Amino acid sequence: PARIKSGTRSEVATCTVDYFPTILDLVGIEMPDDRPLDGISLVPLFEGSLESRPSPLGFHIRGQAAWHDGDWKAYCSKVNSHEWELYNLKDDPHEKKNRAADKLLKLEVMVEAWEKWKASVEASDKGGDY
């Protein structure tokens, strides 16, 4: 709390995967290079020097999936259906206009990145990182 200015607000997307790297940073512990971390330290965000997330966020729970990268979010309510939606969160924060049809290449790149992320998470869950 002594390092965070009262009333600080941010539009940077964060997630629970950021907790561990943030705690490590706050207590001054460095992770070995051979141990991947999915999240980022939020300390620069608290200190006002982080204006955008340096890496995308992936989600996969109960058959739903999302990939958040910068202003864009790809979302699929049923992963097995492969019916992804695409939103520009800066222009459309309430996700009313699905841009999948007119930004197909952008959507394909994001879905491919999500698939690689998911494979990495599954490998890690089986002990692949350790």
Q: Where are the language model's segments positioned?
A:
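C-terminal cap/loop subdomain of S1 sulfatases and analogous C-terminal strand-loop tails that border
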Residues: 3-8, 12-89, 94, 120-126
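Residues within well-ordered alpha-helical secondary structure of globular protein domains
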Residues: 25, 48, 102, 112-116
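Residue-level structural signal for beta-strand termini and adjacent loop
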Residues: 79, 99-101
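C-terminal structured subdomain/cap of oxidoreductase catalytic cores
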Residues: 89, 104-107
